[in-house]
Amino acid sequence: FRNPYLRTTSVYQSLAAEGGTEPVFRTSPPEPWRLVRAYRRQALGKPANPGEINATGYFTASCGITIYRGDAYPEKYRGNLFVGDAAGNIVHRRTLQASGVTFRSHRADPDIEFVASSDNFFRPVNFINAPDGTLHVVDMYREVVEGPSWVPEDLKKQGLVDVLGA
């Protein structure tokens, strides 16, 4: 059932023109346990992506990737990708451009996020194109987005994080 004349170079396509790790611009303070965990990972000297060895500044919990299809906001937003980063308390916006049979995306706002909250409880996890043309943000408003297993035991015991149910 496959078209024998269609040559597929890869079944995987990264939309981000900038590559796999692009900085994000969070305004909320990093959680103390993230700072300690990043320091420990750096001290190990193991190769890792920037999101693992830095407490902030890179996507670590991107979610809810949604294309805005409404008409309530200016035309420049229509067809844009909106991406939540629940760990970074941000909503990131990207533009899409056709690239052959697929697309490429680019950061829409240089050096700033579409929404950057200083509230560490703001966890944008999904988006909904509403019937009135607006884009609704689903916020999992809570302190910790990670599961208890992601926080080192000794940090929980020191009181650097309050994980419900941990």
Model-identified regions with their sequence ranges:
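Beta-propeller domains with acidic blade repeats across secreted/periplasmic ectodomains
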Residues: 1-166
